[in-house]
Swiss-Prot record:
With CysN forms the ATP sulfurylase (ATPS) that catalyzes the adenylation of sulfate producing adenosine 5'-phosphosulfate (APS) and diphosphate, the first enzymatic step in sulfur assimilation pathway. APS synthesis involves the formation of a high-energy phosphoric-sulfuric acid anhydride bond driven by GTP hydrolysis by CysN coupled to ATP hydrolysis by CysD. Keywords: ATP-binding, Nucleotide-binding, Nucleotidyltransferase, Transferase. SUPFAM superfamilies: Adenine nucleotide alpha hydrolases-like. It holds the Pfam family PAPS_reduct. This is Sulfate adenylyltransferase subunit 2 2. Pathway: Sulfur metabolism; hydrogen sulfide biosynthesis; sulfite from sulfate: step 1/3. Belongs to the PAPS reductase family. CysD subfamily. The keyword ATP-binding applies.
């Protein structure tokens, strides 16, 4: 076994230990399933952690109504294939208002449909711990967040008041109404994720692989035209380009990258030469300075 495989096995063991710890320690945990590559790895790890039994907590998808069509199809296929309990939540107030990224802007859309939608769902089901697939290498505010990220009764995160974590000892004490966000993939990198997906044969949406797709260049970002709701502005032209996505979210807010990587080994090779964060394609991260940290302090994942 190579050193890198051993490294991945160590990361796998750490993540599985965290999942088992949460399942034993908390009354009502849930796993946030956003259908991306990190969520796919989390699902795979959860199935391993509790094999041959069933995953002892539900998976939940906060649906903004603007996800890529393929993501929704993939989500439903995985739920049927693996038989896990799936909760899908859409913010009813946002749906009634017709909130969307084009009509209300990216910041308001994200706040109402993602942040408020997530808080609604957590309160509705009384979850006291929620797994997420965030990693420290993704973004600077996530780099300083603990594996067990304490949230108050309003789901807010205080980056100046985080609990110490010594080695693999986690403090899960919460009072009524408080909760913990748990990040088992904290110490993984994007390259680790892709190598693990390849070695374990984990199924992922084909949006991660390069293919000819209809895109519009807007403010320097390639936006895929995923359905008829995408407005084409004056002077814009829809072109078919070989693109793939390094991260997945609401399609109008997720930029594609030009790429020829059509297989997992080609993606891994591309990652070895890449010097930019995968979240460079997330429009919401550029709403304002410190945008992600502000969102997390308001309750965003």
């Amino acid at each position: 076994m190579s050193k890198y495989q051993t490294h991945l096995k160590q990361l796998e063991a750490e993540s599985i230990q965290i999942m088992r710890e949460v399942a034993a320690e908390f009354d009502n945990p849930v796993m946030l399933y956003s259908v991306g590559k990190d969520s796919s790895v989390l699902l795979h790890l959860a199935r391993k952690a509790f094999y041959p039994g069933k995953i002892p907590f539900p998976l939940m998808h906060v649906d903004t109504n603007w996800k890529f069509k393929e993501m929704i199809d993939f989500r439903d296929k995985m739920a049927k294939k693996h038989g896990f309990d799936l909760i899908v939540h859409k913010n009813p107030r946002g749906m009634e208002m017709g909130v969307g990224p084009f009509t209300h802007g990216s910041a308001k859309h994200t706040d109402i449909m993602k942040t408020e939608g997530l808080k609604q769902a957590l309160d509705m089901h009384g979850f006291d711990a929620a797994f997420g697939g965030a990693r420290r290498d993704e973004e600077k505010s996530r780099a300083k967040e603990r594996v067990y990220s304490f949230r108050d009764s309003k789901h807010r995160w205080d980056p100046k008041n985080q609990r110490p974590e010594l080695w693999n000892i986690y403090n899960g004490k919460v009072d009524k109404g408080e909760s913990i966000r748990v990040f088992p993939l904290s110490n993984w990198t994007e390259l680790d994720i892709w190598q693990y997906i390849y070695l374990e044969g984990i199924e992922i949406p084909s949006l991660y692989l390069a293919a000819e797709r209809p895109v519009v260049e807007r403010d320097g970002t390639l936006i895929m035209v995923d359905d008829e709701r995408m407005p084409i502005e004056e002077g814009e032209k829809v072109e078919n380009k070989m693109v793939r996505f390094r991260t997945l979210g609401c399609y109008p807010l997720t930029g594609a990258v030009e790429s020829q990587a059509q297989t997992l080994p080609e993606i891994i090779q591309e990652m070895l030469l890449c010097t930019t964060s995968e979240r460079q394609g997330r429009v919401i991260d550029n709403d304002s300075a410190g945008s992600m940290e502000k969102k997390k302090m308001e309750g965003y994942f």
